[in-house]
Amino acid sequence: MKSILSSFIFLFFMAHALSAEIILQNPKVNEKAPLFSAVNSYGEKINLADFQGQPVILEWSNHECPYVARHYEEENMQSVQKMAQEEGFVWLTIISSTPGEQGHVNPSQANDLTHSRNAYPSHVLMDESGEIGMQYGAKTTPHMYMIDDKGLLRYKGAIDDIGMGMKFFSASFANATNYVATQLSDVKLNNKLAIDNTVA
């Protein structure tokens, strides 16, 4: 899982050192998810607050990360995206790679990735400054967050239990416990989650 924190932390502090309004956060589950706004890959401004009343999934992504690449090459991520949207979730894919760093894309390239991978995000958000990533403490890709219709963060962490290292590339997604896919209904129904926090 590719670390994204180091690639944008310097730019973030440089951009916001003089702003008293920016607060670095690492939200806890069952607390309010930090609000944010960003421009999507089509140039539209997207506000998390606009989705109040709908459950939301945040997916931090870097197409050059080998973990992300395998999830998409084997259509595991697309399968979960489709399941989530069928359950009424808004799926926001967030790209926090800074210019010149691994995984950085411009909006047109982001759209090309979505189409070439047959992905199902509701929006792809461009977070070049890393501000949203800092708000959520997103450190790896894929890093997943589930937010319920009341705006509470219900889950954060890995997408599944395969783990990191070489075992990831030999393990079967079919035999893994997918923390997002298996808990869609519970988040939607505001039920207590069996697992709400894992290491991404």
Annotate each predicted stretch with a short phrase.
Residues 2-11:
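Sec-dependent signal peptide recognition
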Residues 13-20:
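Sec/Tat signal peptide C-region and signal peptidase I cleavage site
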Residues 20-48:
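N-terminal "domain-start" segment that seeds a small globular fold
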Residues 34, 119-122, 138-145:
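Structural micro-motif
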Residues 48-69:
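Short active-site neighborhood of thiol/selenol oxidoreductases, capturing the structured segment around
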Residues 56-59, 90-95, 123-126, 146:
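Structural recognition of the beta-strand scaffold that forms the well-ordered cores
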Residues 69-117, 128-133:
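Structural microenvironment flanking redox-active thiols in thiol-disulfide oxidoreductases
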Residues 148-200:
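Thiol-/selenol-based redox modules, centered on thioredoxin-like
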